[in-house]
């Protein structure tokens, strides 16, 4: 008979063998489970990847179909550009033209390609300009019809919202605005717009729905209208495919121009890449008929001059605490005896050789830095127009009657 010690030793050996077998089984099971998990995960990843690819493909098909539909329906005059945020932007194609071909001889605009179609002297075949004012969208802005324009943004925010869209995007320039305005004048299709609280002050039956649902012409409330909701006569070519709402509704920030202590500063052609510090300083100023710096009312009409001899506020003061200059028509202001006419400023509708041009009032402060808005807003009546130019405000100003419009280089 075996001793108790031998039996205990045998049990220990058997237990160790069982433990080893159990561990081996556990490892085998764990390995098989890991393999199953890997196969499951691989299958899930494959399914998700296939889904994402198909979803992306459907998105591409949908967006491409939308673009083709817009282009087809407009005969190629409109297109859709999706920005890096994925937001749609319906754009008007503006083809290059020669200034002399406009036939606007009395405006003394010179010859050659309009500067809107040149960048650092190199001509462009066409430019794309937002058909509508910019509106709020995911992570940025969009250019679509039938919505409220994005307002209450200052100059720098408007500019950044445009460049945020990606390469070749920019805030509409003073060059692009003027080119469209001059083409409209030559074509006999100068637009009207929302200039009287939801209606045109000229043809009051031309209306669009207001943001406050108010009646057309009711001066209470906010008379701002949805983008592109007016008749085709509110578009620059009087068709449904033209740039909308340039006149009235809301003022529009423009790039590549400013007024510095009364001096007019612009880029020489349509080049948003030029740093603001390198913009060209023209020998052109908005002088004042008086050096009054009391109050905040009008000091009279600006005088186009080769120097600012009288200012209505302290130099480099960007506030609106002092008098301003205003005239009912930008083209009718007096030119000082020593002023040398400037062809580029005529091409930009800042100076004019005749009053027989587009309408619109001019306002300015000849002290501090002032940035341009054009077109007028819903309550400006006869003061609104393609020529309307306000240089009242600093870059930091933001108002519910000021919006912006993106443009794109192809």
Regions found by a protein language model. Give the residues of each.
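Charged, compositionally biased non-catalytic regions
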Residues: 55-81
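Extracellular adhesion/carbohydrate-recognition regions
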Residues: 73-168, 261-317, 370, 403
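Short secondary-structure boundary/capping segments
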Residues: 185-190, 258, 267-270
């Amino acid at each position: 008979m075996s001793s108790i010690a031998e039996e205990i030793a045998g049990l220990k050996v058997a237990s160790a063998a069982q433990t080893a077998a159990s561990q081996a089984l556990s490892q085998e099971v764990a390995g098989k489970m890991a393999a199953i998990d890997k196969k499951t995960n691989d299958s899930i990843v494959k399914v998700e990847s296939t889904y994402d690819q198909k979803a992306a493909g459907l998105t591409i098909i949908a967006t491409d179909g939308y673009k083709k539909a817009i282009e087809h329906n407009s005969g190629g005059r409109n297109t859709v550009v999706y920005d890096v945020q994925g937001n749609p932007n319906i754009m008007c194609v503006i083809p290059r033209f020669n200034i002399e071909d406009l036939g606007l001889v009395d405006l003394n605009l010179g010859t050659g390609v309009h500067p809107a179609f040149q960048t650092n002297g190199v001509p462009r075949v066409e430019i794309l300009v937002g058909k509508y004012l910019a509106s709020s969208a995911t992570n940025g802005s969009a250019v679509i019809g039938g919505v409220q324009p994005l307002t209450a943004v200052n100059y720098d925010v408007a500019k950044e919202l445009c460049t945020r869209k990606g390469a070749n995007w920019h805030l509409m320039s003073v060059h692009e605005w003027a080119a469209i305005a001059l083409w409209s004048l030559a074509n006999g299709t100068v637009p009207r717009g929302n200039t009287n609280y939801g209606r045109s002050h000229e043809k009051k039956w031309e209306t669009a729905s207001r943001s406050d649902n108010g009646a057309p012409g009711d001066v209470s409330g906010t008379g701002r209208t949805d983008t592109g909701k007016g008749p085709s006569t509110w578009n620059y070519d009087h068709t449904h495919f033209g740039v909308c709402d340039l006149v009235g509704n809301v003022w529009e920030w423009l790039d590549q121009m400013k007024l510095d202590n009364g001096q007019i500063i612009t880029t020489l052609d349509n080049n948003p890449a030029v740093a603001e510090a390198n913009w060209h300083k023209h020998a052109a100023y908005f002088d004042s008929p008086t050096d009054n710096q009391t109050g905040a009312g009008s000091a009279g009409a600006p005088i186009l001059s080769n120097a600012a001899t009288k200012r209505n506020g302290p130099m480099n003061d960007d506030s609106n605490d002092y008098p301003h200059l205003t005239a009912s028509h930008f083209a009718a202001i007096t030119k000082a005896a020593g002023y040398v006419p400037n062809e580029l400023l005529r091409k930009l509708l800042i100076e004019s050789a005749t009053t027989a041009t587009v309408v619109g009032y001019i306002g300015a402060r000849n002290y501090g830095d002032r940035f341009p808005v054009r077109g007028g807003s819903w309550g400006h009546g006869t003061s609104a127009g393609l020529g309307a130019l306000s240089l009242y405000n600093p870059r930091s100003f933001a108002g519910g009657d000021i919006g912006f419009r993106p443009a794109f280089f192809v």
